[in-house]
Regions:
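Inter-motif core of Ras-like GTPase G domains
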Residues: 84-110, 122-130
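Canonical P-loop GTPase G-domain recognition
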Residues: 147-206
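Conserved beta-strand/loop subsegment of P-loop NTPase cores
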Residues: 96-99, 128-146, 176-186
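Short acidic, S/G/P-rich loop/turn micro-motifs used as interaction or catalytic elements
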Residues: 32-33, 80-82, 103-108, 145-149, ...
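Glycine-rich phosphate-binding P-loop
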Residues: 22-45
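Substrate-engagement module of ASCE P-loop NTPases
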Residues: 120-131, 167-175
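Switch I (effector-binding) loop of TRAFAC-class P-loop GTPase G-domains
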Residues: 42-72, 81-83
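Short, flexible boundary segments at extreme N-termini or domain junctions of P-loop NTPases and their
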Residues: 1-25, 173, 188, 204
Length: 206
């Protein structure tokens, strides 16, 4: 019975986009690369040089090789605290959330990140006053690792990076988060065509 309850709980949160995914939401901390990721998914060459405040993302075809899938219209919002209330508008049934975190600012943004993660999962589970959301998924995408490596004068294996993020945010102590949070952390260079293709393929081949 306990195993079934755990399975039902984790069913709220897919590890990657699934056939039930209808929308993509890219959220996160200021400067983590949200607009850069949207540009990469849309094959736009614009480089994010200023802070995004709020702009509409029109429906578009996400393409990778010969494969493609329609991505529903949504919004690209800023990463400041002012924009957190917009999460309620962007996360609906069937939404997969990519939450972007700049590995170089984890310590200074720790409290803000933890608060936002708690809000997202409470929304999905219906513990923030709403009805809850069905068929949603979630992943933390760790960005700017190249700068992190340069600052630390060495590279880290992926597993060590994930541990650094998980421990730095103390994910295990955030009430309401799935127990498998370590499996939901991925690293990515948003300026790398290969890494963008990996994300595209993950969304397309769901």
């Amino acid at each position: 019975m306990i195993d079934l309850l755990i399975y039902a709980l984790l069913g709220y949160f897919f590890l990657k986009p699934s056939k039930k995914t209808k929308k993509i939401a890219i959220l996160g901390i200021k400067g983590a690369g949200k607009t850069t990721l949207w540009n990469g998914l849309r094959d736009e060459s614009d480089v994010e040089t200023v802070t995004t405040h709020y702009q509409k993302i029109e429906e578009f075809s996400l393409k990778s090789g010969k494969d493609e899938v329609k991505i529903a219209s949504t919004k690209d919002i800023g990463g400041g605290d002012y924009y957190v209330p917009y999460y309620d508008e962007l996360i609906e049934d069937g939404t997969f959330v990519y939450f972007l975190v700049d590995i170089n600012t984890i310590k200074e943004n720790k409290d803000a990140i933890r608060m936002r993660l708690r809000k997202i999962f409470n929304m999905i589970k219906g513990e923030s006053g709403g009805a809850g959301k069905k068929d949603c998924g979630f992943k933390i995408l760790v960005t700017h690792t190249d700068v992190f490596f340069n600052n630390n004068l060495k590279r880290m294996p992926k597993a060590q990076l994930i541990e650094y993020v998980s421990d730095g945010l103390e994910l295990a102590t955030i009430k309401g988060l799935p127990r498998d949070m370590a499996k939901r952390i991925e690293t990515g260079n948003l300026n790398s065509p290969n890494d963008i293709k990996t994300i595209k393929d993950e969304i397309i081949h769901r």
